[in-house]
A protein has these predicted regions:
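Active-site rim helix/loop that mediates acceptor-substrate recognition in acyltransferases
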Residues: 1-15, 19
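Conserved acetyl-CoA-binding loop-helix of GNAT-fold acetyltransferases
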Residues: 44, 50-63, 83-87
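Residue-level recognition of the GNAT/N-acetyltransferase active site
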Residues: 40, 45, 49, 73-75
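Conserved beta-strand in the GNAT
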Residues: 17, 23-31, 36-43
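C-terminal "cap" of GNAT-fold acetyltransferases
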Residues: 71-79, 87-88, 94-110
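Alpha-helix C-terminal capping segments
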Residues: 8-11, 30, 57-68
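Conserved N-terminal glycine/acidic-rich loop preference
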Residues: 18, 37, 80-92
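A conserved beta-turn-beta hairpin within the catalytic core of GNAT-like acetyltransferases
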Residues: 31-40, 49, 68, 99-101
Length: 110
């Protein structure tokens, strides 16, 4: 995934960060629609893995955006992300292959 600063500057999505001390340790990107909320991306710096940051960002989103359902997509090989989403109440709804040969999974939370 390659995105430029210009892409972020014109993006209409919402971004929330998680700071640990003075370091931006994680960030979540949300696209909020009138009928659902889409988790566009969730990234945690590797140094901060396994510290609950992704879970805290997801919990914040659930409290801040009350419009359900929520949905998220990731690669089927991204087992840590899939496990996190399932722990947070998401269930798998479909899998498909992208034009780039990547197998993806979509999970929803009602």
């Amino acid at each position: 995934l390659q995105r430029t600063i210009e892409n972020f500057a014109v993006c209409k999505n919402d971004f929330f960060g998680y700071f640990k001390d003075d370091t931006l340790a994680g960030i979540i990107e949300i696209k909020h629609h009138t009928s659902y909320t889409h988790v566009q991306s969730l990234v945690v710096l590797p140094f901060f893995f396994r510290q609950g940051i992704a879970s805290q960002l997801m919990s914040f989103v659930f409290m801040h955006y009350r419009k359900k359902p929520f949905f998220v997509e990731t690669g089927v090989k991204n087992k840590p992300a899939i496990n996190l989403y399932k722990k947070m109440g998401f269930v798998e709804v479909k899998q498909w292959d992208t034009d780039y040969g990547i197998r993806k999974i979509r999970l929803n939370k009602s």
